[in-house]
């Protein structure tokens, strides 16, 4: 059962608004986190979702606890290469759609 969530956005006001809305809907604590403080939120998390259209790396492998589940739902560029290449498992839905967008997966296969 989820007990805590963190919401990060490049615009602090957006993070605060979305956190408040989600907390009301979900019924558990949702804390807004400044972009510069995202490392601390990732380190405390068992599940990390990234949803962005940006190309900035937002999550790094050494921030993750062992066993953390990471779902990339955005631009496919929001995690550092090591998050993919050092993962225990990489799960894809449709190869023909994903393979051209995620060169790290091709790199894993070639290794």
PLM regions: where:
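NAD(P)-binding Rossmann-fold cofactor-contacting core
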Residues: 2-26
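Generic secondary-structure signature for well-ordered alpha-helical cores
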Residues: 20-27, 47, 75, 95-96, ...
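Rossmann-fold NAD(P)-binding glycine/threonine-rich loop
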Residues: 63-111
């Amino acid at each position: 059962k989820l007990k805590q969530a963190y919401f990060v956005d490049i615009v602090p006001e957006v993070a605060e608004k979305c956190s408040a809305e989600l907390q009301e809907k979900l019924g558990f604590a949702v804390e807004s986190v400044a972009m510069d403080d995202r490392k601390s939120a990732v380190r405390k998390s068992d599940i990390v979702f990234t949803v962005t259209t940006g190309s900035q790396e937002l999550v790094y492998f050494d921030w993750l606890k062992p066993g953390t589940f990471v779902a990339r739902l955005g631009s496919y560029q929001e995690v550092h290469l090591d998050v993919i290449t050092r993962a225990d498992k990489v799960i894809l839905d449709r190869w023909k759609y994903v393979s051209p967008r995620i060169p790290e997966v091709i790199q894993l296969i070639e290794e």
